[in-house]
Amino acid sequence: YVDGTIWFHGASVGEILSIIPIIKRFEKDSKIKKILITSSTTSSSQILSKYKFKKTIHQFYPFDLNIFTKLFIHYWKPRLAIFVDSEIWPNMYNNLYKRKIPLILLNARITKKTFNRWKYFPNFSKNIFEKISVALPQNKESKKYLKLLGTKNIKIAGNIKFYGAALSNYNISSLK
């Protein structure tokens, strides 16, 4: 990951605040040269700007259209993508997979209601969820649903909003 960017994506303020301890740790890691954080809200961008990180930059998440996600990946060249909570984006996942960029779903959350929606499209769902390299769900329920939807590598990490940064001690080098 020396030459590449570590990319985090969270929808808004809550997800971004939950990864601040991880960002702080990665900021201190000399092997990590650039950290990209994307979100969909201006408020999360404003909060990030208050931290004055040196290696971390914020961009807004692109529309999940095939051409936009391809261009985004080509421009930023992430070595690792970490999506927070329930951020499931089919085109982005597919293009990360095609480029052999590992994808972690951190603090993964799938409710019964969400699961029931995904199971109406079993082939489509499997095609998306099997592209997750590692899922770190909040609880056993989310683990069960992720497995049923096609995710293979799942380890319960708890809710990082309450228990701290599970990923900060996770061996990301094993995903190379």
Label for each model-derived stretch:
Residues 2-171, 175:
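Active-site and donor-binding regions of nucleotide-sugar-utilizing enzymes
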